[in-house]
């Protein structure tokens, strides 16, 4: 957080935690969903993507308890399975605000051609569909318009975000969702430390 200067931006994308949580709602821990190429998306085709649920939580709250929802993702483009953790963006908003970041305002969004500081890839795709035939946007989106059904399913599980750094100081400690912020920060720090150890392995 402290490596970003005031006036700088923190930009990224990931699977949307709550969207993925709902996607896997009826899946047991250790099981998952698999997508194959081809029109019928059946197992006779080549596996292009797979998600395996590695948690057994039954709900996702907007606090530090939502940071340990592990999933394993297989992606055919790299032919590898890797561990990810669901991002609860409503909780991330709270964390970012606490550390001096805010979402972009309407003028800032207008300058970069976006409607939201955080939104789904489905929204971006729908916006692209309205723009793709305009002269200004001609050729701008490459092959995005011709995504397959499976590629859309994967893509629409993702969210983009843009936060702007507006101050260095951290907000005072207060109670949020029944949990002391200091305790919240400690638990978050412990999770990150354990995640670093797991990455080293």
Cite the ranges covered by each PLM segment.
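Surface-exposed alpha-helical segments enriched in charged/polar residues
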Residues: 1-2, 94
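Switch/connector loops and helix/strand junctions flanking conserved nucleotide-binding motifs
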Residues: 20-22
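Conserved beta-strand signature within the Rossmann-like core of class I S-adenosyl-L-methionine
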Residues: 3-15
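An acidic- and aromatic-residue-enriched active-site/binding cleft used to recognize and process polar
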Residues: 15-17, 108-109
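C-terminal lobe and adjacent flexible extensions of AdoMet/dcAdoMet transferase-like proteins
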Residues: 26-201
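Short acidic, glycine/serine/threonine-rich loops at helix termini
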Residues: 3, 24-25
